[in-house]
């Protein structure tokens, strides 16, 4: 567990691990597996860190995870997200949720040209 905590602190450049990881430590196997997965997925790749954090915020809002919203909004702000970017992100999340529900409610069939 200590090695995982040390890796989290080093990777995230923070003095201590946040509550999420402390709660996961109740099951060291889950802690290690989850950290390794998060570390791999959130590493720099085709998407830059800010984009990944903003996607995480959007999914967290949709899933209603207050802890994840707070954590990843802070990380996105640290990576450069401005108030204007956050506002647009919330507008997109809200619109996507609304139009998704309408499409599902009306049972709109997928257009042939979209089914690729």
Question: Can you describe what each PLM-predicted range is?
Answer:
Residues 1-116:
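Hydrophobic alpha-helical segments
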């Amino acid at each position: 567990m200590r090695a995982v905590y040390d890796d989290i602190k080093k990777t995230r450049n923070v003095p201590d691990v946040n509550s999420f990881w402390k709660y996961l430590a109740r099951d060291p196997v889950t802690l290690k597996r989850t950290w390794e997965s998060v570390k791999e997925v959130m590493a720099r790749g085709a998407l830059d860190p800010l984009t990944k954090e903003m996607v995480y915020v959007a999914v967290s809002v949709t899933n209603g995870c207050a802890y994840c919203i707070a954590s990843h909004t802070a990380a996105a702000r640290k990576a450069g997200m401005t108030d204007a970017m956050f506002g647009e992100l919330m507008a997109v999340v809200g619109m996507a949720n609304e139009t998704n529900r309408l499409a599902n409610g009306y049972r709109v069939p997928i257009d042939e040209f979209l089914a690729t």
